[in-house]
């Protein structure tokens, strides 16, 4: 579960390393976000000589969370880290590659992330 002030790693090659969640989208009383939800983030650390600068505000989609997710068949899945993928203003992925596994729940939200990911759990 991701909330305001949560830090996430960026798992694409956009140039950002770590981001801070500043807003969970989806209503005024919505506190938590999970896999497949869109959040507003600010970039905290970047790769040297990248086009993304520290402090940029952007939208991101969550691809991995530490909190376990219950699936339709009753099984649970959880990951080792909280990770997201940065989006541009039109909602497309900023990077061209995704590192690490992503959750199967993203198929209903964004198919391009699933096709770029090396492993879908």
From Swiss-Prot:
The keyword Ribonucleoprotein applies. Keywords: Ribonucleoprotein, Ribosomal protein, RNA-binding, rRNA-binding. It comes from the Bacteria. One of its GO terms (biological process) is translation. CDD domains: Ribosomal_uL14. Signal peptide: none annotated. InterPro entries: Ribosomal_uL14, Ribosomal_uL14_bac-type, Ribosomal_uL14_CS, Ribosomal_uL14_sf. GO terms for molecular function: large ribosomal subunit rRNA binding; structural constituent of ribosome. Transmembrane segments: none annotated. Disulfide bonds: none annotated. GO terms for cellular component: cytosolic large ribosomal subunit. Binds to 23S rRNA. Forms part of two intersubunit bridges in the 70S ribosome. Belongs to the universal ribosomal protein uL14 family. Part of the 50S ribosomal subunit. Forms a cluster with proteins L3 and L19. In the 70S ribosome, L14 and L19 interact and together make contacts with the 16S rRNA in bridges B5 and B8. This is Large ribosomal subunit protein uL14. It comes from Azobacteroides pseudotrichonymphae genomovar. CFP2.
